[in-house]
Regions:
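Terminal, low-structured helical/coil segments at or just beyond the last alpha-helical repeat
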Residues: 27-29, 294, 302, 322, ...
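Alpha-helical segment of the N-proximal tetratricopeptide repeat
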Residues: 39-73, 90, 188, 222
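Helix-start (N-cap) detector for alpha-helical repeat units in TPR-like alpha-solenoids
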Residues: 36, 42-44, 78-79, 112-113, ...
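Bacterial signal peptide processing site
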Residues: 21-24
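Structural signature of tandem alpha-helical TPR/SEL1-like repeats
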Residues: 55-66, 90-103, 125-137, 159-171, ...
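Structural marker of alpha-solenoid helical repeat scaffolds
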Residues: 73, 107, 141-142, 175-176, ...
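Residue-level recognition of tetratricopeptide repeat
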Residues: 51, 86, 120, 154, ...
């Protein structure tokens, strides 16, 4: 659900000027008195200018500069830190986005939009347990914060804590019966436990409530994938993309299905469509790199260089991105035949990736092969595709 939820956060950005200095909130739970001094008027002016610039895709650098200036003038202006965090995250700079959102949360711990944005960034960085911890603390203090609780379901599921995720999804449904998004999230929890029939029933309920729910159609696609029906999954993801053209998650999922099928050129089209909406989306850049690598078959130098450049951009913004590290290692080792240059990427991947990550065995094999004077040739394999997203971007 990343992209759909992130769009909500981005909308909040435009309204961020209404609560300066601990005033009344218009989003999330009611604000409490923060004890902060009144906001510096010049800082507020720069923040407003930054938010205005952020609405123009060509003015992102200007927006970042203005928001940084607002923070320099008034370090306690949490709204500016929140806005800057959202702009940086939308630009793919997740590490710096997390820094700003952590600072905003420290200044304004009662703000739901800040807690949600911080947790979403942590999810996108692969830190699902940290995201869940952030949200668990928040909903404990704010039981009625449904956006935070719904994202908590996703974070817990991503962290493999399906029982806790199911309990939280039911809490959402108690407070908001028949909520289409909560039903779709609950379906994903049951799918994660291997209960595909239950997941299918819940998806049907979600679509009965809202037949145009992009989230529900994406979950339907994942249920089809779990049943081995890639064609039906692709159709469901296509419906999701039709219902929400600005949500790149469905494009990413279609790309992943096409990668699995070896349809590299068509997969590349889907990732390029996602990048047309979100030019710096890391998952789309990594997916496009994998598609180009597959399409090149190790022979098209131009495609391989484009793939390398895409992965390099992701790692420049987030050096800890495990998917980019692994894919760069595979590109260097298998496509460019540079095992010595691949080895550091695989080693960094092994340092960063969770112990249960499915690509760890291959990374370990590559590291061991690079250590040998005459490593055994690797068996040919399709490029690793980004796993279909559960309905995030994001």
């Amino acid at each position: 659900m990343i992209r759909s939820r992130w769009s909500v956060v981005a909308i909040v950005l435009a309204a961020g000027v209404v609560a300066c200095g601990g005033g009344k909130a218009t989003h999330g739970p009611k604000a409490v008195e923060t004890g902060l001094p009144p906001a510096n008027p010049l800082a507020v002016q720069r923040m407003v200018e930054g938010v205005t610039a952020a609405k123009d895709p060509k003015m992102q650098a200007r927006a970042i500069a203005l928001l940084n200036e607002a923070i320099r003038i008034d370090a306690n202006l949490w709204e500016a830190r929140f806005d800057l965090g959202v702009v940086l995250a939308n630009a793919g700079d997740l590490a710096k986005a997390e820094e700003q959102l952590k600072a905003a949360a420290k200044i304004a711990p009662e703000r739901e939009e800040v807690a949600v944005a911080l947790a979403e960034v942590r999810r996108r960085r692969g830190e699902s347990k940290e995201a869940a911890s952030t949200l668990e603390d928040f909903v404990k203090d704010h039981p009625g914060a449904l956006d935070a609780r719904t994202l908590l379901v996703t974070a817990l599921r991503d962290a493999g804590q399906h029982e806790k995720a199911i309990a939280q999804a039911r809490e959402v449904l108690v407070r908001k019966p028949g909520d289409s998004t909560a039903l779709a999230e609950l379906a994903l929890c049951h799918l994660g436990r291997g209960e595909r029939d239950t997941a299918q029933l819940l998806v049907k309920q979600s679509l009965d409530v809202n037949a145009k729910s992009a989230i529900a159609h994406r979950v339907q696609g994942l249920v089809h994938l779990a049943g081995g029906d890639d064609a039906a999954a692709f159709q469901a993801f296509s419906k999701a993309a039709h219902e929400d053209p600005h949500d790149t998650t469905s494009r990413l999922n279609m790309g992943a299905v096409l990668l699995r099928a070896g349809a590299y050129a068509k997969a590349a089209e889907q990732y390029k469509s996602a990048l047309a909406v979100a030019p710096d989306e890391p998952a789309a850049q990594i997916g496009l790199a994998a598609a180009l690598r597959g399409e090149s078959a190790g022979k098209d130098a131009r495609m391989l260089e484009e793939a390398r450049s895409l992965l390099e951009k992701v790692l420049e913004r987030d050096p800890h991105n495990v998917a980019a590290l692994f894919n760069m290692g595979v590109l260097q080792a298998d496509s460019l035949k540079r095992p010595a240059e691949a080895k550091p990427y695989f080693e960094r991947f092994l340092d960063e990736a969770p112990r249960e990550h499915p690509s760890r065995p291959e990374a370990e094999r590559q590291v061991n092969a690079a250590k040998n004077a005459a490593p055994a040739p690797a068996a040919p394999a399709p490029p690793p595709a980004p796993a279909p997203k559960a309905g995030g971007k994001t």
